[in-house]
Amino acid sequence: MDFDPTAEQQAVADVVTSVLERDISWEALVCGGVTALPVPERLGGDGVGLFEVGALLTEVGRHGAVTPALATLGLGVVPLLELASAEQQDRFLAGVAKGGVLTAALNEPGAALPDRPATSFVGGRLSGTKVGVGYAEQADWMLVTADNAVVVVSPTADGVRMVRTPTSNGSDEYVMTMDGVAVADCDILADVAAHRVNQLALAVMGAYADGLVAGALRLTADYVANRKQFGKPLSTFQTVAAQLAEVYIASRTIDLVAKSVIWRLAEDLDAGDDLGVLGYWVTSQAPPAMQICHHLHGGMGMDVTYPMHRYYSTIKDLTRLLGGPSHRLELLGARCSLT
C-alpha cells in the first residue's frame, strides 16, 4: 500500500485548495469547477473516481468549509457512480456540475447508518422516518435506504415532510418523514443493499473528518507559534508541545485509516475491518483532539467567528451522525468476535 497521492489526486487537492484559500462557500466550489470533478465526462464533468473524491473532501475539511460538499459529492455522487445505471446517473447527476445539491437519508431514530433500516418499501411505496438528512430542502434528489431497497426520491415528492433540526455548525439538517411516497421502477437502484451505501458513506465521512482534524491541528500550531506569554511563543512550552503531539497522533492515525478505507473500496477489496476502525477512531479520537485545540486557543476558541469553531462543531456533528464512540466500538467488537 502506497498512500502517497497520485498526480491526479494531488491535482484535485490543488484545485480545491486554490478555490478555498479565497472563498470557502459552496458557490465558490461551484464556480471553481470543484463540483464538476466527480461528474462523468458525458455530463460535463471530469470523471474522477473515489480516490480523488476522498482527496477533495479531505481538502474541504482541511479548510473548515461548511457546505453541501459532503452531502452532494460524498453521500450523493459517490454511491450513484458505483451503484446506479448510466440512465439513472444521467438524470440524477445532471445538475451537480452547475451546483445542484444531492443528499442521502441514511440514519433513523436511534440508528446510525443501519444496514437493516426500519424504513419500508412495499408495492412501490416508501414509508418511514429518517434523521440527520443534510441540505434536504436544497436538494434535487435524495438517496434513501429502506428495508429491501435503495431508492432515489425528490424531497418535494408527495408524502415527504421535512422538519429542520439544529446542528452544532449551523448547517441545514432535517428529519424526513415519508408516508407512502410513490417510487417509480426507474428510481430504484437495482440489486443494491443499504450495507454498501453505508460503507461508502462512512468512507467519505472519514475523508472529511481527516481534513477537519488536520486543519484544526495546523490552525492551532500556527496560533501557539505566534501567541506569546512571558515573552516566549506558547509553542515553546513543554506542556503545549505535548498536547499538540497528542493531536498530531490522532490526525495521522485518522489519516491512515481513512486512506486505507478509500483504497480498499476503490480496489474492490474487503474493507470491513478498516471501516470498523475508522468509525470508532473518528468518533473516539477526533472530539478529544478538537477539545485540545480549543483549549490551546484560550479565549480565542470561544469566538464563533474564528475558524476553530467550524472545525470543532463539524466534528461534533459527524460524531453524532456516526452514532458516537460507544456505538462504533460495539460494532467493531461484534466484528472482532466473529473472527
Curated annotation (Swiss-Prot):
Q: Which cofactor does it need?
A: FAD
EC number assigned by the record: 1.3.99.-
InterPro entries noted in UniProt: Acyl-CoA_Oxase/DH_mid-dom_sf, AcylCo_DH-like_C, AcylCo_DH/oxidase_C, AcylCoA_DH/ox_N, AcylCoA_DH/ox_N_sf, AcylCoA_DH/oxidase_NM_dom_sf
- Describe activity versus pH: Optimum pH is above 8. No activity is observed under pH 6.
Q: What class of enzyme is it?
A: oxidoreductase
Give the UniProt keywords, A-Z. Cholesterol metabolism, FAD, Flavoprotein, Lipid degradation, Lipid metabolism, NAD, NADP, Oxidoreductase, Steroid metabolism, Sterol metabolism, Virulence
Kindly tell me the pathway this chain contributes to: Steroid metabolism; cholesterol degradation
Q: Which residues form a coiled coil?
A: none
- Which residues does the record give as FAD binding sites? R227, Q238, H295, G299
- Catalytic function, reaction form: 3-oxochol-4-en-22-oyl-CoA + A = 3-oxochola-4,17-dien-22-oyl-CoA + AH2
Provide any one GO MF term from the record.
Answer: FAD binding
What does the record note about the cofactor?
A: Binds 1 FAD per heterodimer.
Pfam families in the record: Acyl-CoA_dh_1 (PF00441), Acyl-CoA_dh_N (PF02771)
Q: Which family does it belong to?
A: Belongs to the acyl-CoA dehydrogenase family.
Kindly give the PANTHER family that the UniProt entry links to this protein: ACYL-COA DEHYDROGENASE, ACYL-COA DEHYDROGENASE FADE28
Subunit description: Heterotetramer composed of FadE28 and FadE29.
Q: List the protein's name.
A: Acyl-CoA dehydrogenase FadE28
